[in-house]
Protein backbone atom coordinates (compact mmCIF):
# COMPACT_ATOMS: atom_id res chain seq x y z
CA UNK A 1 0.00 0.00 0.00
CA UNK A 2 0.97 3.66 -0.27
CA UNK A 3 4.56 4.44 -1.19
CA UNK A 4 5.55 0.77 -1.21
CA UNK A 5 2.95 0.12 -3.90
CA UNK A 6 3.78 3.24 -5.93
CA UNK A 7 7.55 2.63 -5.77
CA UNK A 8 8.06 -1.06 -5.01
CA UNK A 9 11.45 -2.49 -4.10
CA UNK A 10 13.40 -3.73 -7.10
CA UNK A 11 16.94 -4.45 -8.27
CA UNK A 12 17.96 -3.40 -11.78
CA UNK A 13 21.49 -3.29 -13.14
CA UNK A 14 22.93 -4.12 -9.74
CA UNK A 15 21.19 -1.17 -8.10
CA UNK A 16 18.42 -1.48 -5.52
CA UNK A 17 15.65 1.12 -5.39
CA UNK A 18 12.52 1.54 -3.31
CA UNK A 19 11.32 2.91 0.04
CA UNK A 20 14.01 2.84 2.73
CA UNK A 21 16.86 1.70 0.49
CA UNK A 22 18.94 4.82 1.19
CA UNK A 23 17.47 5.74 4.57
CA UNK A 24 18.65 3.52 5.84
CA UNK A 25 18.71 -0.14 4.91
CA UNK A 26 21.82 0.37 2.77
CA UNK A 27 23.58 1.85 5.78
CA UNK A 28 22.74 -1.17 7.91
CA UNK A 29 24.07 -3.55 5.26
CA UNK A 30 27.21 -1.43 4.88
CA UNK A 31 27.78 -1.63 8.64
CA UNK A 32 27.59 -5.42 8.60
CA UNK A 33 30.00 -5.79 5.68
CA UNK A 34 32.42 -3.23 7.13
CA UNK A 35 32.46 -5.03 10.48
CA UNK A 36 33.02 -8.38 8.76
CA UNK A 37 35.88 -6.97 6.68
CA UNK A 38 37.57 -5.39 9.70
CA UNK A 39 37.35 -8.66 11.60
CA UNK A 40 38.74 -10.76 8.74
CA UNK A 41 41.65 -8.34 8.27
CA UNK A 42 42.39 -8.31 11.98
CA UNK A 43 41.96 -4.54 12.20
CA UNK A 44 39.65 -4.46 15.21
CA UNK A 45 41.83 -3.66 18.24
CA UNK A 46 39.03 -2.53 20.57
CA UNK A 47 35.44 -3.55 21.35
CA UNK A 48 32.96 -2.58 18.63
CA UNK A 49 29.19 -2.59 18.97
CA UNK A 50 26.66 -2.47 16.14
CA UNK A 51 23.26 -1.17 17.19
CA UNK A 52 20.17 -1.06 15.00
CA UNK A 53 17.29 1.18 16.09
CA UNK A 54 13.80 0.04 15.00
CA UNK A 55 11.92 3.07 16.36
CA UNK A 56 13.98 6.10 15.28
CA UNK A 57 11.09 7.70 13.40
CA UNK A 58 9.10 7.69 16.65
CA UNK A 59 11.89 9.42 18.56
CA UNK A 60 13.62 6.18 19.66
CA UNK A 61 11.54 5.64 22.83
CA UNK A 62 12.98 2.13 23.27
CA UNK A 63 16.35 2.35 21.51
CA UNK A 64 17.38 5.48 23.42
CA UNK A 65 17.49 3.49 26.66
CA UNK A 66 19.79 0.91 25.09
CA UNK A 67 21.96 3.65 23.61
CA UNK A 68 22.37 5.18 27.06
CA UNK A 69 23.74 1.83 28.25
CA UNK A 70 26.22 1.15 25.43
CA UNK A 71 27.54 4.66 24.72
CA UNK A 72 29.44 5.43 27.96
CA UNK A 73 33.15 4.83 27.38
CA UNK A 74 32.86 4.74 23.59
CA UNK A 75 35.70 6.46 21.72
CA UNK A 76 33.51 7.26 18.73
CA UNK A 77 30.01 6.75 17.35
CA UNK A 78 29.24 6.57 13.64
CA UNK A 79 25.75 6.67 12.15
CA UNK A 80 25.39 5.18 8.68
CA UNK A 81 22.25 7.12 7.80
CA UNK A 82 22.91 9.11 4.59
CA UNK A 83 24.10 12.62 5.36
CA UNK A 84 23.04 14.31 2.15
CA UNK A 85 23.46 14.45 -1.65
CA UNK A 86 26.92 13.73 -3.01
CA UNK A 87 28.09 11.74 0.00
CA UNK A 88 28.02 14.58 2.51
CA UNK A 89 29.08 13.69 6.05
CA UNK A 90 27.04 15.23 8.86
CA UNK A 91 29.10 16.56 11.78
CA UNK A 92 26.25 18.36 13.58
CA UNK A 93 22.49 18.41 13.63
CA UNK A 94 19.84 20.41 15.40
CA UNK A 95 17.70 18.92 18.13
CA UNK A 96 13.92 19.03 18.11
CA UNK A 97 11.00 19.16 20.50
CA UNK A 98 7.22 19.13 20.59
CA UNK A 99 4.87 20.91 22.99
CA UNK A 100 1.10 20.71 23.33
CA UNK A 101 -0.75 23.79 24.63
CA UNK A 102 -4.31 23.60 25.98
CA UNK A 103 -6.44 26.57 27.05
CA UNK A 104 -9.76 26.37 28.89
CA UNK A 105 -12.24 29.22 28.71
CA UNK A 106 -15.92 29.72 29.41
CA UNK A 107 -18.64 29.37 26.81
CA UNK A 108 -21.37 31.96 26.31
CA UNK A 109 -23.55 33.26 23.50
CA UNK A 110 -21.46 35.79 21.60
CA UNK A 111 -24.46 38.01 20.83
CA UNK A 112 -26.64 37.91 23.94
CA UNK A 113 -24.13 37.53 26.77
CA UNK A 114 -20.60 37.94 25.42
CA UNK A 115 -19.28 39.36 28.71
CA UNK A 116 -20.28 36.19 30.56
CA UNK A 117 -17.77 34.16 28.58
CA UNK A 118 -13.99 33.89 28.46
CA UNK A 119 -12.52 33.16 25.05
CA UNK A 120 -9.95 30.39 24.98
CA UNK A 121 -9.19 31.29 21.36
CA UNK A 122 -8.27 34.87 22.23
CA UNK A 123 -6.11 33.63 25.09
CA UNK A 124 -4.27 31.11 22.94
CA UNK A 125 -3.77 33.82 20.31
CA UNK A 126 -2.02 36.03 22.88
CA UNK A 127 0.11 33.11 24.05
CA UNK A 128 0.99 32.12 20.48
CA UNK A 129 2.23 35.63 19.69
CA UNK A 130 4.27 35.65 22.91
CA UNK A 131 5.78 32.25 22.09
CA UNK A 132 6.67 33.41 18.58
CA UNK A 133 8.99 36.08 20.02
CA UNK A 134 11.41 33.31 21.04
CA UNK A 135 12.19 32.57 17.39
CA UNK A 136 15.88 33.34 16.70
CA UNK A 137 16.99 32.31 13.22
CA UNK A 138 20.52 33.65 13.74
CA UNK A 139 20.98 31.10 16.56
CA UNK A 140 19.29 28.36 14.58
CA UNK A 141 16.38 28.39 17.02
CA UNK A 142 12.93 27.86 15.52
CA UNK A 143 9.62 27.95 17.39
CA UNK A 144 6.63 27.12 15.20
CA UNK A 145 2.96 26.82 16.13
CA UNK A 146 1.97 24.55 13.28
CA UNK A 147 -1.48 23.37 14.39
CA UNK A 148 -4.22 25.25 16.22
CA UNK A 149 -7.91 24.55 16.85
CA UNK A 150 -10.69 25.56 19.20
CA UNK A 151 -14.22 26.75 19.77
CA UNK A 152 -17.60 25.20 19.08
CA UNK A 153 -19.36 27.68 16.77
CA UNK A 154 -18.99 31.14 15.27
CA UNK A 155 -21.62 32.65 17.57
CA UNK A 156 -20.19 31.17 20.78
CA UNK A 157 -17.36 32.45 22.95
CA UNK A 158 -14.78 29.65 22.65
CA UNK A 159 -14.61 27.40 25.73
CA UNK A 160 -11.45 25.61 24.58
CA UNK A 161 -8.47 25.92 22.27
CA UNK A 162 -5.30 23.95 21.72
CA UNK A 163 -2.14 24.13 19.64
CA UNK A 164 0.94 22.09 18.81
CA UNK A 165 4.36 23.70 18.85
CA UNK A 166 7.52 22.39 17.18
CA UNK A 167 11.02 23.44 18.26
CA UNK A 168 14.48 23.06 16.74
CA UNK A 169 17.74 24.21 18.34
CA UNK A 170 21.49 23.84 17.87
CA UNK A 171 22.55 23.42 21.50
CA UNK A 172 20.98 21.65 24.45
CA UNK A 173 21.29 24.86 26.45
CA UNK A 174 19.21 26.77 23.89
CA UNK A 175 16.61 24.01 23.83
CA UNK A 176 16.23 23.93 27.60
CA UNK A 177 16.07 27.73 27.74
CA UNK A 178 13.34 28.07 25.12
CA UNK A 179 11.20 25.40 26.81
CA UNK A 180 11.47 27.34 30.09
CA UNK A 181 10.54 30.59 28.28
CA UNK A 182 7.51 28.97 26.66
CA UNK A 183 6.30 27.60 29.99
CA UNK A 184 6.70 31.05 31.53
CA UNK A 185 4.73 32.67 28.68
CA UNK A 186 1.94 30.11 29.08
CA UNK A 187 1.70 30.85 32.81
CA UNK A 188 0.77 34.49 32.10
CA UNK A 189 -2.98 35.06 31.64
CA UNK A 190 -4.30 37.85 29.42
CA UNK A 191 -8.02 37.00 29.18
CA UNK A 192 -9.60 36.77 32.67
CA UNK A 193 -11.43 33.52 33.30
CA UNK A 194 -9.13 31.35 31.18
CA UNK A 195 -6.57 28.80 32.29
CA UNK A 196 -3.84 26.98 30.42
CA UNK A 197 -1.56 23.96 30.60
CA UNK A 198 1.34 22.85 28.45
CA UNK A 199 3.01 19.46 28.08
CA UNK A 200 5.92 18.03 26.14
CA UNK A 201 9.40 19.42 25.72
CA UNK A 202 12.69 18.36 24.13
CA UNK A 203 12.34 15.21 22.07
CA UNK A 204 15.62 14.63 20.25
CA UNK A 205 18.76 16.20 21.66
CA UNK A 206 21.07 18.06 19.27
CA UNK A 207 24.18 16.54 17.74
CA UNK A 208 26.50 19.41 18.59
CA UNK A 209 29.70 20.00 16.65
CA UNK A 210 32.88 19.49 18.67
CA UNK A 211 36.64 19.19 18.24
CA UNK A 212 36.62 15.41 18.68
CA UNK A 213 33.96 15.08 16.00
CA UNK A 214 35.98 17.22 13.60
CA UNK A 215 39.01 14.96 14.16
CA UNK A 216 36.89 11.91 13.39
CA UNK A 217 35.64 13.61 10.23
CA UNK A 218 39.28 14.17 9.24
CA UNK A 219 39.85 10.41 9.41
CA UNK A 220 36.74 9.79 7.32
CA UNK A 221 37.90 12.36 4.76
CA UNK A 222 41.36 10.78 4.52
CA UNK A 223 39.84 7.32 4.07
CA UNK A 224 37.53 8.64 1.37
CA UNK A 225 40.42 10.16 -0.55
CA UNK A 226 42.17 6.78 -0.58
CA UNK A 227 39.05 5.44 -2.32
CA UNK A 228 38.87 8.32 -4.77
CA UNK A 229 36.07 10.11 -2.91
CA UNK A 230 36.01 13.76 -1.89
Please describe what each predicted stretch is.
Residues 1-19, 39-41:
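Acidic/His- and Gly-rich active-site-bordering loop/insert found
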Residues 15-29, 109:
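Glycine/serine-rich anion-binding loops at beta->alpha junctions
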Residues 6, 39-41, 66-68, 90, ...:
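Short, flexible, glycine/charge-rich loop motifs used to bind or transfer phosphoryl groups or to couple energy/partner
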Residues 1, 21-24, 51, 70-71, ...:
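Conserved short hydrophobic patches within well-ordered secondary structure
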Residues 82-83, 91, 97-230:
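Metal-dependent amide/peptide-bond hydrolase catalytic core
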Amino acid sequence: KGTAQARPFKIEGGRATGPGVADMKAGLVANLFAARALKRLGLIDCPMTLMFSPDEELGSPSASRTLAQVLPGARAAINSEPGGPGGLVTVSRKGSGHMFLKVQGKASHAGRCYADGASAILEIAHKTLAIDTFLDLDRGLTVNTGLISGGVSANSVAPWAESRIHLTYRTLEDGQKVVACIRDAVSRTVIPGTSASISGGLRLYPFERCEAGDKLFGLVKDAGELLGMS
